[in-house]
């Protein structure tokens, strides 16, 4: 296992404005509304990422396509750090305003949806999904559909997944971090296993359960319990560890220039500049491989005994 694979991405919160009203959205831990990250901070973030050879930068919000300069931002990042794996997470609201050149420059595109059912679309994200699906079809190989599983969409989940597969998209399923409804997760996992077979655990920066369909498209499940298999060095001695709903899946850079690896912002840096904060915090996000393998091997032993 390459330990570098376990280091999380640098996530740039480009703005805090969003067109959607998803009750489960954690807003990347941000409580400030209508704020945009200045280009100067974006530049510092990219410079730090290049210095540390961070493998992946993710653009998020809010809704990042609400940035009228999103094309310029993507171009800037790729010019300054061509080797970086650059992704964006969007609900597709203004995807039609994003240039083809930008879509080509992006290495990964994550489209967040809740359902294809009109009442649910109106309730949560208020986006005509036919538009982003049509735009992203030529980029299917680098597009993943993110779906948060809730009571509202669980009964139609397999049909939603299959429709995404029909477009050639991979699918990531997630669960509400705060509620962490074990009964819902168990019910959904049982249903998906009957349809797609047993899922295996894959160890990335966020551990996931994964299976493939007949066309070798990925179906990944991000469950809080599985994510917690991986404990980062910075978390081990943190007095707030028990209060975390999400174990670190990214180092977040916020529009006001503060940097934190956790949604609750308990862990911050004493450094002044954005650049120095990233250089200070990111190296602390490693994983104790002895701990990780110990957990995995204990799990294997318990399976043998049962």
Label each residue range with its predicted role.
Residues 9, 13, 26, 58, ...:
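Conserved beta-strand segments that form the floor/walls of ligand-binding pockets within enzyme
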Residues 2-40, 52, 261-262:
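Canonical Radical SAM [4Fe-4S] cluster-binding loop centered on the CxxxCxxC motif
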Residues 39-59, 67-174:
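Radical SAM/AdoMet-radical enzyme domain recognition
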Residues 1-12, 21, 53, 209-210, ...:
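N-terminal [4Fe-4S]-dependent radical SAM core
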């Amino acid at each position: 296992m390459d330990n570098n694979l376990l280091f999380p991405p640098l996530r740039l919160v480009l703005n805090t404005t969003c067109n959607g009203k998803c009750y489960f959205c954690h807003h990347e831990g941000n409580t400030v509304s209508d704020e945009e990250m200045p280009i100067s901070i974006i530049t510092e973030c990219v410079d730090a990422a290049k210095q540390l050879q961070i493998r992946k930068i993710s653009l998020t919000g809010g809704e990042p396509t609400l940035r009228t300069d999103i094309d310029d931002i993507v171009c800037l990042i790729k010019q300054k750090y061509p080797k970086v794996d650059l992704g964006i997470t969007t609900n597709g609201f203004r995807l039609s305003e994003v240039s083809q050149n930008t879509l080509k420059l992006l290495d990964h595109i994550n489209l967040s949806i809740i359902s294809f059912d009109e009442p649910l679309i109106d309730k949560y994200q208020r986006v005509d999904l036919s538009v982003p699906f049509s735009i992203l079809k030529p980029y299917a190989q680098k597009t993943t559909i993110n779906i948060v599983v809730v009571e509202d969409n669980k009964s139609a989940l397999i049909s939603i997944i299959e429709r995404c597969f029909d477009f050639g998209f991979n699918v990531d399923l997630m669960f509400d971090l705060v509620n962490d409804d074990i009964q819902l997760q168990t019910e959904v996992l049982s249903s998906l296993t009957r349809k797609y077979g047993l899922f295996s655990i894959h160890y990335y920066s966020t551990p996931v359960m994964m299976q493939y369909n007949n066309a070798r498209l990925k179906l990944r499940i991000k469950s809080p319990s599985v994510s917690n298999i991986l404990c980062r060095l910075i978390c081990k001695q943190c007095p707030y560890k028990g209060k975390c709903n999400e174990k670190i899946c990214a180092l977040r850079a916020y529009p006001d220039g503060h940097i934190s690896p956790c949604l609750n912002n308990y862990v911050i840096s004493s450094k002044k500049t954005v650049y120095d904060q990233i250089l200070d915090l990111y190296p602390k996000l490693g994983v104790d491989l002895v701990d990780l393998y110990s957990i995995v091997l204990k799990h294997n032993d318990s399976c043998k005994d049962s």
